[in-house]
């Protein structure tokens, strides 16, 4: 979870959860500390979400029991969030966005940009305030053949660079590992081969 604050306004980017370490006995999940957000709930204009992985949406049901604000995400991400909320009997103001949309939340002008990740329908944000311009990449991988057919919009990245960025918050997962990450399309091709060779029933476990 990232909170951006300008004067008396706050926008939250993502709100995930993680699982406890082996020595954290009796703890089922780990969520962010919401105390500052709850204390300043009247300042929060909304939650904007980059993608649907658990470490980016898993905390949303918990924070929405503390504050009532709209949640903005793409269609697939919003569907995953909605399922989590329904499991807990929580109703929320969920608002669908598409890559390329522009959102105005108080003093925050937010542009959504198509990116690619290991989950479909991922976006990143170019956020402009009277004080500074911020680029939040979300989690991303350079994938020109993603499973949803929507490649990363590097042209828009270049345009944003020309407009000016004061702060960039970038994903760095596995950044120190050498080599390149294969396209998600490669995963599908491998699965096709495995399924084709299977002689009996196929059982798939998903998370």
PLM feature segments, named:
Residues 1-48, 53-207:
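His/Asp/Glu-rich metal-coordinating catalytic cores
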